[in-house]
Amino acid sequence: MAEFEHVTVLLHEAVALLAINPTGTYVDATLGGGGHTGEILKQLTTGKLYSFDQDDTAIKYNQTRYADEIAAGKLILIHQNFRQLKVALAEQHVTAVDGIVYDLGVSSVQFDDGQRGFSYNYDAELDMRMDQRQTLTAKTIVNDWPFNDILRVLSRYGEDRFPKQVARKIEQHRDKGPINTTFELVDIIKEAIPAPARRKGGHPAKRTFQALRVAVNDELGALEDSLTQALELLAPSGRISVITFQSLEDRLVKQMFREKTSMPDLPAGLPVLPGQFEPDYKLLTRKPILPSETEMTDNHRSESAKLRGIERQ
């Protein structure tokens, strides 16, 4: 079993935003190495925590790490994608919760495990599946999907400056034979991107790998589905805290929270009494909470992190 050495970002800030009730019911939608789960468990007395992860490695690791809490019925691990939030909780007879935390960063363990195919720094099969039970892999996308579909993925999810060039080069190479490994794909990307652009802005394969990972795991679709359910599951005064690491996710969270906390559109001239049309939710963070300078120095992966929160009225 892989040892989780994942450093949880904005650990205390994300949990503090939930204002934990020791007897409440909580959800960690992204169990990972169990950092947020552990922090919530410390603050619970008779409360319960339901922690989700689609990654079998994370579930097995935390079954050992939190064996006592699981045996005591304080922690329930759920091996599901967080888009199954409502269904999975209903199976546990839970229909309302007091708080939910999301940490949308890919686990360091997933990046650093060369066999998972997430990283352009390790040579491995082009996999990128968070959930090993699913069939779609990055290898399937680059070898079997039409040019226009690959172009759409690179443009939409990678925010790439050269999506057409990369997609075209992938098409040319796969005509000669299948693209099987991460390093094969890295070489193709380097070949596609103009030399001056390769020398700045980080690793040239970064955005392409991000785009493929998001597509393989339908990350944005799953996030939107899950947040929609999470907002409905919140009890009055219940809270959600979300840590994002890239602009696509942050934009989605910001937009969904803004829609839920805005006044409804009303006909012009309609007499409205104060408090008559209050939104059901309020923002806890007008601007996102960012990591401290110390945290960013100690953990460079935290640099892009943003924390947002919302509360049900």
From Swiss-Prot:
S-adenosyl-L-methionine binds at residues 34-36, 53, 82, 103, 110. Signal peptide: none annotated. One of its GO terms (cellular component) is cytoplasm. SUPFAM superfamilies: Putative methyltransferase TM0872, insert domain, S-adenosyl-L-methionine-dependent methyltransferases. Its main location: cytoplasm. Keywords: Cytoplasm, Methyltransferase, rRNA processing, S-adenosyl-L-methionine, Transferase. One of its GO terms (molecular function) is rRNA (cytosine-N4-)-methyltransferase activity. It is found in: Cytoplasm. It comes from the Bacteria. Residues 297-313 have a biased composition (Basic and acidic residues). It holds the Pfam family Methyltransf_5. GO terms for biological process: rRNA base methylation. NCBIfam families: 16S rRNA (cytosine(1402)-N(4))-methyltransferase RsmH. This is Ribosomal RNA small subunit methyltransferase H.
